[in-house]
Amino acid sequence: SPVWKDLYPSARMADGMAAGVNVGMTGIGYNKKMFDEKKWPAPTSWMDFADPKFKGKVVFQSLPASTFGLHGFLMFNRIQGGTDSNVEPGFAKWKSTIGPNVLEYIPSSAKLSEMVQNGEAAIFPLTPTGVATQKARGIPMEYAQPKEGSVLLTVAECVTARNDSPELAQKLAAFLLTPQAQAAALEFGNQIPSNTKTQPSTPAAQATVDRFKEYMKTVKVLDWDAVNQLRPEWNTRWNKTIER
């Protein structure tokens, strides 16, 4: 595709097998209403999940089921001295730090809006786009960029082999990478463009992109080769030792 060269490097998958249609990051979402009422400062670190004041108010996505949960755990693991191929520090420290604060491990983020509205959830892993979507529905959420960095998250597309409309599929895939398509996705869906030439069509959309560029300065990229190889083992261990 001619637009390939215009994509962020992180949106260009190995060997051109796929391309990111939007980019984002997993950081910290929090209950703005609760924080305001209790006069708590906004979160600044992944280690805020271990703050005793959040006991029974942390909601964490399940590592085996959710990329957000995986991202949050791996950042905690890095802070404890681990790497993406060595999660011993994370598993060893979880039960004495974040674990006691967790109200519920959820399989997806679908329950978060209800749990925020009900005053159950104070703090949770989430993306800026996810937070913006909930805010647009009147849910009192805000996003905080952890000082240790957020984790890069890319939604990618590829055309499947031997489909019955290969030319149309390629045209659609190429269109979704254009500045035109991504400007619309940004304006109407808060989707952060992967095409660097996308021009935001409204001041609000421009503000979203400006915030994203700030977040990208400290974003972390996982070693997905190691993660994909080891994740089945982590899933089993998580289910046996964390989420029982």
Language-model segments: residues:
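Extracytoplasmic ligand-binding site segments that recognize negatively charged/polar headgroups
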Residues: S1-Q117
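A ligand-binding cleft/hinge motif common to bilobed small-molecule-binding domains
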Residues: Q117, I123-P140
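Mature extracytoplasmic/periplasmic domains
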Residues: T160-V219
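Extracytoplasmic/secreted proteins, especially bacterial periplasmic and envelope-associated proteins
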Residues: T44-S45, H71, M75, N86-P89, ...
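Ligand-binding "clamshell"
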Residues: S10-D15, T133-Q145
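Conserved C-terminal helix/tail region of periplasmic/extracytoplasmic solute-binding proteins
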Residues: Y215-R244
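Periplasmic-binding protein-like
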Residues: A92-I98, Y105-I106, R137-A161
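A bilobed periplasmic-binding-protein/Venus flytrap-type ligand-binding module shared by bacterial periplasmic
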Residues: G29-M34, L74-I79, T154-P166, A184-E187
